[in-house]
Amino acid sequence: MKRSLGLLLISGLTLLSIREVDARPVALVGGRLIDGFGGPPLANSVILIDGERITAIGTVGSMTIPPDAEVISTEGMSVLPGLWDCHVHTMLLGHSDYEHWDKTYPSRFGSEIMPAAAHQLLMAGVTSARDLGAPLKESIEVRDRINRGEIPGPTLYVAGPFIQHEPYPGTEAFRWGVKGASDARAKVKQLADAGVNIIKLIDQDQMTMDEVQAVVTEAHAHKLPVVAHAHRPDEIRRGLAAGVDDFEHTGLSTAPEFPPDIRSAIAERTAKMSLGPLFWCPTIEGFLNYDDLIRNPEQLDDPAWELDVPKDIVSDIKQSIRHAGQLSYYQITPLRSVTVKNKFRQLQESGVVMLIGTDSGIPMKFHSGSTWRELDAWVNKLGVDPMSTIRAATYWPAVQMKVDKDYGSISEGKFADIIAVKGDVLRYIDLLQRVDLVIKHGHRYK
């Protein structure tokens, strides 16, 4: 009893000391500020943080720093909003065999695997993420534990289980099938009542149009956005017809481009200003970097992906990816790189607002390194302007989730979600692979 009381007192003192440190104002001084709005960076910036929020922004010599503030030098650094990853799967850690994973580890999702994924994301500079497919109970619990400060991780916007025509055998906990429009509405209502932040729709080309429409209409009635797969042409056609808010991926086929009717339908949708932007999360890094990965599999040995992962799971993952170039999951990937580039360009031309997302957690895509690689691929393999790329990982995701009042840019009054990295990320975007400073809600984690 005495030992338990002692541990309780130590825990209480630890929490108290953290609160005391966080109670002091913080000043980030000297860095080059990229605020998320797309304007010219602010040199010699000063950012004042009080508690969880940003209270003032200025430059060295133009504003007074409170005498009791903790001063953190950001000289020589790029300072920018905490990154968003708009497509993660915290229930996955990069193992190559889904069937084995789904049979072996569900009992450890909520207690070990999802918290480890969340911590890895945060250490990579990801302070907000959309978790698009995981068991409902664990999704809510892990999100809420992060929000309460019990475990480290990004602010999570969770979908819980996929909504689809029929779950694959053994995946019923995180894939919910629907039978008819009434059942579709009931499933969405169940998710909404449980507290999800977003609805994930997949394989909608295998559902009736009434079912697809019921999912979207019910979700919107609960003020929840709907994201949907865009792997196959009919998924896009039905999603557009039903009013889906955001599409994921650019397709799994080797077709060289989108069919003409889909390009026209996308352009017609983006022209409807009253509906707001049509968002798209292409998740293309894995296609464009696959050849590099096979030539240099040493990158799979980065210990960052082992953070908080139990040793037996680390060993299992390593065993599953030991022959990286032989995984059936990726054999057609080299043939998709050209179509990915074409479709990305067509989406740009059609006026969609694209978001940074990675599908992290799928085979060989680790939460610790997927996000910066996606930004790097946009800039260095697709020629996207670095500032636009950064906005796709900061400002626009917050707009899509309708939380831009509090997130997405470094602005007075917003939550202090801030990262910093040595060097000029507008010239060398890959510097983001080594984030030096991570602040989330005013608390420094790195």
Show where each model-derived region lies:
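Active-site core of metal-dependent hydrolases
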Residues: 201-336, 362, 382-383, 401, ...
